[in-house]
Amino acid sequence: MNYLILGAGPAGLTVATKLKQRGEDSFLVLEKEREAGGLCRSAMVDGYPLDIGGGHFLDVRRPKVNEFLFRFMPKEEWNIYIRNSQIKLNDLFVHHPLEANIWELPENLQKEYLVSISNAGCNLNTPMPDTFVEWIRWKLGDRITDDYMLPYNQKIFSDTLNELGTYWLDKLPNVSYEETLESCKKHKAYGTQPGHAQFYYPKKTGYGELWKGMADYLGNKIIYNVNVKRINFVEKNVNSLDGDCFHADVIINTIPWKEFDEFIGMPEELVDKISKLKHSSIETRYFPHDLDTEAQWIYYPDSTLPYHRILVRSNFCMGSRGCWTETRKERVCMFSEKINPEFRFESEYAYPLNTVGKQEIIKELLNWCEKHQVYGLGRWGEHQHYNSDVVVERGLKLVDEL
């Protein structure tokens, strides 16, 4: 066999689909679950689709990616939305990102935030710190840091935030005192919009239906319920938990590296580094009541609440009702035992954590693997917090390179 693809999430499906479109027939996809889609799967809950891996949408910003995907769910089957995401600060709701929407706060709070921003290290030209917590404080000022950024990131990623690096925060813009002041005077947001400022969501189904369409196109090229646990870099094969062996000239891995129990032929020091990769696990749980809001998702930095985010399904899934919460696994115990959700699902691998030293580990790992014709791809193959549209783009690029 020419190509073996591990995982039938967006990354694996994209590579397999592109190979087939190019006339390649000697390939196979191995999937642990009984259906394709990975974190982007959907389930019917209370009569409408719910995205079990959390909030996943199709960004409008990559037309070539969307053109590729619309072959499996035509453009006319999607609605397009302008993102409405909000943050709940105590009893107030402010649009996300907070630093661009200080003007929505009461005037007394605007003044406090403005003073804090003026004293941020990046605005005083003080040296850039090395630790995550102090870097955030240097970049955004004390108020945004303490009221939102630190408590929210603790809820979604880790209680010990300084295990995170700062190398992935460069995309955060400096918070300008002058621009924030002008924003407050004009009652208008400033700066660039976050990802998914505009997004597509299916009119009649969940996001998972897109990936099912790709899986249907691949047909028997996907084998389900195969839990790969061993990879042999010498013999170019993998073994499943059931003992089945699959061989290929090129192996494309899109599953978490920590899912492997054994790495034959890999240096022990590199195997040890893989064990240092970290991730967070997220539970989604559905509640049938509607929220009185136009927001599609709401961020909750309040540390007394277990969940960090609510997705308001009725505001992007036509005709539906209800909402779902997203909660880091370690905080699920904070829910009252009296609260019995109609549906819950836990994603063990939800977010790869950008820990100190991670980028060096991944660079060394991927470079070594490529020398043995094994390629890491996607959120888990590259251990990067990629959204599905980015994953598809990278999958298409990899096929071109191969």
Where are these predicted regions, by residue range?
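Dinucleotide-binding Rossmann-like beta1-alpha1 core, especially the glycine-rich loop
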Residues: 46-124
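Mid-domain catalytic core of redox enzymes
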Residues: 22, 227-343, 364-368
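N-terminal Rossmann-like FAD-binding beta1-loop-alpha1 element of flavoenzymes
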Residues: 2-29
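Active-site/ligand-binding neighborhood in enzyme catalytic cores
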Residues: 92, 110-234, 244-247, 254
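Conserved flavin/dinucleotide-binding core of flavoenzymes
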Residues: 42, 97-98, 312-402
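Conserved Rossmann-like nucleotide-cofactor binding loop
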Residues: 11, 35, 258
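Glycine-rich FAD pyrophosphate-binding loop
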Residues: 20-45
